[in-house]
Amino acid sequence: IGNMFAQGSDQPDRFLESNVVKRTNPYAIVKESFEVSGSQATNIGYIDVGGGDYRYYIKSEMDTRQRFMDKREMVMLLGQKVTNIDTTNGITDIDGTEGYFSALEDRGMVTSDLLGSNGLTDLDALIKEMDKNGCPAEYAVYSATRQDLLLDDMVAGAGAGTNVTAGVAASFGAFNNDRDMALNLGFKSFSRGGYTFHKNSFKLLNDPTLLGNDDVHNRLAAGVMIPLANVVDPRSGERAPALEMNFKSAGGYDREMEHWVTGGGVLGFTNDTQDVAKFHYRSECCLVTRSANQHVLIQGTV
C-alpha cells in the first residue's frame, strides 16, 4: 500500500523494477498459384464473369484468388507457433504464427461452457472476470448459431427492461454513437453490468465445411468477444486497436497482396517459354492480439 520511515533515516536500498513482457509474432508467408494453358485460355464457357466475358478460365482464376484470401484469413485465425519442425521435407526455417484462437487460449479469458447455458449466471461470472482485467465498456460478440441462440434466449428470458439493459445506457461508440449503424451492420446489442455487447453471427463457425460442428465449438471455439477499444501506450500515448492485421512493407514495396503473371506468350505474358499463363499470389502478414487478457474465447462443454 505504501511505506513510512523514521526521521533522519536513509533512502531505501530496495526498489521496484517494471516487469516488461515483450511479445513478438512471426509473419506468415501465404502463397497460391493458378495455371491456364494457351489452348484453355481461348475456350468459351457458359458463365458470364462480367462485362460479357465468357472465357471459363477467368472464373477459375477469380475462385483461386478468393480461396487464397480465405486461406490467409484461416491462417490468421488458426495459426500456431511451431516448436518442433519436421525437417524431412527440407523445411527448417518456418516458425509458424500465433493465430487469434491460439492467442486467446494462451492469454485470454476462456469460458468453461456456452454463455447462457445457465441463464444470466454465466454472463455475470464473465463480467466479474472482465472487471478484474480492466476491460473496456464495449464488445463485439461473434458466435456460432448454437451460442447465438442461447444469448437470444438469455436476453428474452431475463425480460427486457428488467435484468438486462435496465438502467444502463447502451454504448455505441464503436459505431460513431449511432444505433442504426450497428443494426445496419447486422449487430444486435444488449447491456449488462456496465458493459454493452454487440453480437453478430460468425459465419466461419456455421459453415459445415469449415468450423461449423459441435466438436469444433467444444474443443476450439463457439464464439469470441472482441474489445472495441484501442490499447494506449503509457509512454508515447499512441493508440493501437485491440486486434490488428499487419503486413510487411518498406520503401514503397508492399507485401499485403502481391499478384503477378508469368507466361510463354499466353495472354500476352512473355517472361517464360512454357505454353501457359501462371497467376501467382503472395502475402506476408501476421495478426496482433493486444491485451489478450481482455478478449474472450467461448468454448462449449466436451
Question: Where are these predicted regions, by residue range?
Answer:
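Flexible, glycine/threonine- and acidic-rich loop/arm segments that mediate assembly and lattice contacts
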Residues: 1-181, 187-189, 195, 201-209, ...
